[in-house]
From Swiss-Prot:
This is Putative multidrug resistance protein MdtD. Disulfide bonds: none annotated. PROSITE patterns: MFS (PS50850). The gene is mdtD. It is a multi-pass membrane protein. The chain crosses the membrane at residues 12-32, 49-69, 72-92, 101-123, 138-158, 165-185, 195-215, 220-240, 265-285, 286-306, 342-362, 393-413, 431-451.
Length: 471
């Protein structure tokens, strides 16, 4: 990349900082949830909505982000994404109630949904094709550093300042990024086909209402009538979209995707798999602080081995899948993740805190292997004309499943923890024990789906589609 013009390198730096802001925000908030609950006068059982509101908004907005960038221009959309994300951060810091915080996180999510896919599109347009992989490696590196710094940085800010600062630190970065975007980034546009607005609204309504209905009366305090109405709207919206997309070449996502057996298994497995593993980043810092009495900083530090294990495993995951095949890797990793979550709970309750970093390191390795395998399995057999649509749907499902996973984790805590749960609660350990046992069952369930994957260990078949989808 040293032979790229200076202006292109500066543009890559802008995209990299956008990736960093978005990835940092996904991990820095988890550590601060108990402190937020105390400051806002809320039960920790309700704080999962701070995560759900952001991730669900990202899932809803993802399908529109690429089209908007092509239609309006990458500079305009990337600038808008940074401004919305920064404004959302400011409103989060100023929030005095949980409802205000949740609404501010929705605004953040709109910006976050546009930032990463539009950033990828920008890199594709400003660098030569032969240097695309090197450029993407460069801009995504800060995105890998974000999850590493997030938990510890969140713990430091909460312990030595206040939780408001986990959002305020986005302001200077966002202001500089917005100015640099207007100054340095070209406004590339592309010819676009007509956007399926009706299909987008149907899918958005279905995802949002069903996720809110899942949180239901315990989490949101809504009436039975409202709950039933949300469920009906959600189901009708999804069924209406399926009817709308039938034989519709302009549909947001073609139903032809589901005729591909590998894609169908991979997508369903990815949804159920991430539903389980999406609970862990939310539950771990909450358990460490509320269940074990760790300080926010100590809890944040404990999350670092998990991120290191995940990053380290990415270097060898292709070789592992090539050697053992998708079916063995996915089934073993799924059952292994369920087991390691129980080991983490057992080691913690026995007071062997010095072993926890090692357990979390292995948890990160297993989770990373499973994520990478699910992604490439899902896309590897798609024909070229469906690859882009299939990748977009997979990205949306990934975010949606993590949103549902955090919601389910909050429901489990609420079911076992009743009205309130604090560090001084006598039954806190039992509450988290039952919650983790239930989570382990949910995490293990996708093994039944992955057992149906053809046992193909051919190297070309395993990584061939991955290389084509990255071009």
């Amino acid at each position: 990349m040293t032979d790229l013009p200076n202006n292109v390198r500066w543009q890559l730096w802008i995209v990299a900082f956008g990736f960093f802001m978005q990835s940092l925000d996904t991990t820095i908030v988890n550590t601060a949830l108990p402190s937020m609950a105390k400051s806002l006068g809320e039960s920790p059982l309700h704080m999962h909505m701070v995560i759900v509101s952001y991730v669900l908004t990202v899932a809803v907005m993802l399908p529109a982000s690429g089209w908007m960038a092509d239609k309006i221009g990458v500079r305009n959309i990337f600038f808008t994404a940074i401004v919305l994300f920064t404004l959302g951060s400011l409103f989060c810091a100023k929030a005095d109630t949980l409802n205000e915080l949740v609404m501010s996180r929705v605004l953040q999510g709109v910006g976050g949904a546009m930032m990463v896919p539009v950033g990828r599109l920008t890199v594709m347009k400003i660098v030569p094709r032969e240097q695309y992989m090197a450029a993407m490696t460069f801009v995504t590196l800060p995105g890998q550093v974000g999850p590493l710094l997030g938990p510890a940085l969140g713990g430091i800010l909460v312990e030595y300042a206040s939780w408001h600062w986990i959002f305020l630190i986005n302001l200077p970065v966002g202001i500089v990024g917005a100015i640099a975007t207007l100054w340095l980034m070209p406004n590339y546009k592309m010819q676009t086909r007509r956007f399926d607005i009706f299909g987008f609204v149907l899918l958005a309504a279905g995802m949002a209402t069903l996720t809110l209905a899942l949180d239901g009366q315990k989490g949101l305090g809504i009436s039975t009538l409202t709950l039933c109405l949300l469920i009906v709207i959600g189901i009708v919206s999804i069924l209406w979209y399926l009817w709308h997309a039938r034989d519709n070449d302009r549909a947001l996502f073609s139903l032809a995707l589901f005729r591909n057996t590998t894609y169908r298994i991979g997508l369903f497995g990815s949804f159920v798999g991430r539903l389980g593993s999406g609970m862990l980043p939310f539950m771990t810092p909450v358990f460490l602080q509320i269940g074990l009495g760790f300080s926010p900083f100590h809890a944040g530090l404990m999350m670092i081995p998990m991120v290191l294990g995940s990053m380290g495993m990415k270097r060898i995951v292709v070789q592992v899948v090539n050697y053992f095949g998708y079916r063995r890797v996915l089934v073993v990793c799924t059952l292994g993740l369920a087991l390691i979550s129980l080991v983490f709970m057992a080691v913690a309750l026995m007071g062997w805190y010095y072993v926890l970093p090692l357990v979390l390191f292995f948890q990160g390795m297993i989770n990373s292997t499973r994520f990478s395998s699910m992604n490439t399995l899902t896309l590897k057999d798609l024909p070229d004309e469906l690859a882009s649509s299939g990748n977009s749907l997979l990205s949306m499902i990934m975010q949606l499943s993590m949103s549902v996973g955090v919601t389910v984790a909050g429901l489990l805590l609420g079911m076992y923890g009743q009205q309130h749960l604090g560090a001084d609660t006598a039954g806190a350990h039992h509450v988290f024990l039952y919650t983790y046992l239930s989570m382990a069952v949910i995490i293990a369930l996708p093994a039944l789906i992955f057992a149906r994957v053809p046992n193909d260990t051919s190297k070309n078949v395993v990584i061939g589609r991955r290389k084509r989808s990255e071009r």
